Design a protein with these regions (language model features):
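N-terminus-centered regions that define maturation/targeting leaders and the start
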Residues: 1-107
């Protein structure tokens, strides 16, 4: 299965988790704009499931998209935190890809 995490390590309160999704089918080739991939939604730093886009309070922030290929599906419930996901993935990561983008609020 696949797992996807998006976070912002430059948030004033520490790393802010924008998106946590796991048990994504490995056949997934893309995620269309405005959609969520098939899989189980974890909890972001707003305390909700699903994607929360970038909206930094000030300055330029780095946003990391981390995609993990796993050797199994994870037995975790919807709303799982990134910390619990990372713990469950230990020993199951086959490969990892990472993309970083910068974003600054306009105005």
């Amino acid at each position: 299965s696949l797992a996807l995490v998006m976070d912002d390590p430059d948030a004033p309160v520490g790393t802010w988790d924008h998106w946590v999704v796991f048990n994504i089918p490995p056949s997934t080739k893309q995620i269309a704009k405005g959609t969520e991939p098939n899989g189980v939604a974890g909890r972001n730093s707003w305390g909700r499931t699903g994607y929360g886009g970038p909206c930094p309070p000030s300055g330029t922030h780095r946003y990391f998209f981390k995609l993990y290929a796993l050797d199994t599906e994870l037995n975790l419930p919807e709303g799982t935190t990134k910390k619990d996901l990372e713990r469950a993935m230990q020993g199951h990561i086959l490969a990892k890809a990472e993309l970083m983008g910068n974003y600054k609020r306009g105005g």
